[in-house]
Amino acid sequence: MAQQAQLGLQDAASPIMEELIHFHDHTLTVVFLISVLIFYLIIVMVTTTFMNKHSLDSQEVEIVWTVMPAIVLITIALPSLRILYLTDEISNPHLTIKAVGHQWYWSYEYTDYHQMEFDSYMIPTNELEPGGIRLLDVDHRIVVPMESPVRMLITSEDVIHSWTIPSLGTKVDAVPGRLNQATFITTRPGLFFGQCSEICGANHSFMPIALEAVPLSNFENWTTKVLAS
């Protein structure tokens, strides 16, 4: 989860987020090198007074400043396209969860189980237990088995919302009348928080998401307990 005064990205908890972090670092390196080059050229232009009236045009220079930006764009675009297709790749999910956005809470349905559904509301600050996370903890968390492909089906009952968990690299719009999907695999156990990332009304800031990744045996015990209740 995010830390106070954090400037970087959250620690990755899924393969997709690891890819996104690597792509971020790759792109930042390219942009930094371009910025250094441009800054150097600006300094040279400002501090020198060299003039050459005979250098009116240069075919070689025009080729270079056309080809080089194209190469730079390709080095950025290819990894981006690869990750784009990876985020849309869904095959043989072990678990499917349907998330429905409401003003201003989420409801979840485990479609592989009979009548296993619940609403998830933010816990008010005055009701938080010691150790609870203000504005992020909820009364009913999503629980998923770690190291298993999970498919999320996401929609909305009223206005546009966005189901987002940064540590998993997942952000999907919840649109009324439309069923969007996403997939993720949690690579480690833990508690991961997110929030609605689409302004959806007065209490937009108060519809968090809490997902708990646990070993498969713990997940089976949890489902048995939920179904029994």
Curated annotation (Swiss-Prot):
SUPFAM superfamilies (alphabetical): Cupredoxins, Cytochrome c oxidase subunit II-like, transmembrane region
Mode of membrane association: Multi-pass membrane protein
TM helices/strands, residue ranges: 15-45, 60-87
Coiled coil feature spans: none
Major localization listed first in the record, in broad terms: mitochondrion
Record-linked PROSITE patterns: COX2, COX2_CUA, COX2_TM
Leader peptide range in chain numbering: none
Cofactor field: Cu cation
GO annotation, cellular component aspect: mitochondrial inner membrane; respiratory chain complex IV
Function: Component of the cytochrome c oxidase, the last enzyme in the mitochondrial electron transport chain which drives oxidative phosphorylation. The respiratory chain contains 3 multisubunit complexes succinate dehydrogenase (complex II, CII), ubiquinol-cytochrome c oxidoreductase (cytochrome b-c1 complex, complex III, CIII) and cytochrome c oxidase (complex IV, CIV), that cooperate to transfer electrons derived from NADH and succinate to molecular oxygen, creating an electrochemical gradient over the inner membrane that drives transmembrane transport and the ATP synthase.
Protein name, UniProt field: Cytochrome c oxidase subunit 2
